[in-house]
Design a protein with these regions (language model features):
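Acidic, metal-coordinating helix/loop segments flanking the phosphotransfer/catalytic sites
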Residues: 31-50
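Active-site residues of response regulator receiver
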Residues: 54, 82
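Receiver (REC) domain active-site loop signature in two-component systems and cognate sites
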Residues: 57
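C-terminal output helix
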Residues: 86-88, 102, 106-115, 161, ...
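Recognition helix of helix-turn-helix DNA-binding domains
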Residues: 158-191
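Basic, Lys/Arg-enriched C-terminal extension of HTH/homeodomain DNA-binding domains
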Residues: 181-212
Length: 212
């Protein structure tokens, strides 16, 4: 799968040099002359990627762009590159979720491993998101009765409790549970509960571990 590195820096020479270096390393590269330029061309997250971001720029600076992207729900990992390193800036950036903070001039031995780590992190994030998107779509395939059973199963109800709540037999409820598991494709009941919680179906409810 192709990956894209987004380079944000007001220094045209740096952008050109970085684009050349990263292209030679096999990455797709998009360059931006300012933080606002990136916001105006907000990157798609349909492919794995990361952002190489200068700390000091006219207008929005790097940390301010980091905050904006976070509020927009972006999951692109950020690697800061700065010619003026200082400990407070580095600490704030890392605490806010930056992958790394590198100092200009940055060597390939520092840059490429940092990018590889960021890309791996984003690939994991996208895989989790895709799994949740699939889970949401599979829930829509449940029949009304299966959805009722599903709602009780993820709250830890036994077959007997579910049958009492819905007015059916344990045998019928067990059959519905089997179909729910087949349709939603979790590896276990524990994963079913975890997925349901991550897509917001449990709210703040306290859920016990479901029994088989």
């Amino acid at each position: 799968m192709p990956v894209r590195v987004h380079v944000v820096d007001d220094d045209a020479f740096f952008r050109t040099a970085m684009e050349r270096r990263l292209t030679q390393a096999g990455y797709e590269v998009a360059t931006y002359l300012s933080a606002q330029n990136l916001l105006d061309r907000l990157p798609s997250e349909s492919m794995p990627g990361c952002v190489l971001l200068d700390v000091r720029m006219p207008g929005l600076n790097g940390p301010e762009l980091q905050e904006r992207l976070s509020k927009l729900g972006s999951t692109l990992p950020i690697i800061f590159i700065t010619g003026y390193p200082d400990i407070p800036t580095t600490v704030r950036a890392i605490r806010a979720g930056a992958e790394d903070v590198l100092t200009k001039p940055v060597s390939a031995d520092e840059l490429l491993p940092a990018i590889e780590r960021a890309i791996a992190r984003h690939e994991t994030t996208l895989a989790r998101k895709n799994k949740l998107d699939l889970f949401r779509s599979l829930i829509k395939t449940l029949t009304p009765r299966e959805r009722q059973v599903f709602e009780l199963v993820i709250r830890g109800k036994t077959n007997k409790q579910t049958a009492n709540a819905l007015g059916g037999t344990e045998r019928t409820i067990k059959a519905h549970r089997v179909r729910v598991m087949e349709k939603l494709q979790p590896r276990s009941l524990a994963e079913l509960v975890s997925l349901a919680e991550r897509v917001g179906l449990l709210g703040d409810a306290s859920v016990s571990q479901p029994t088989v």
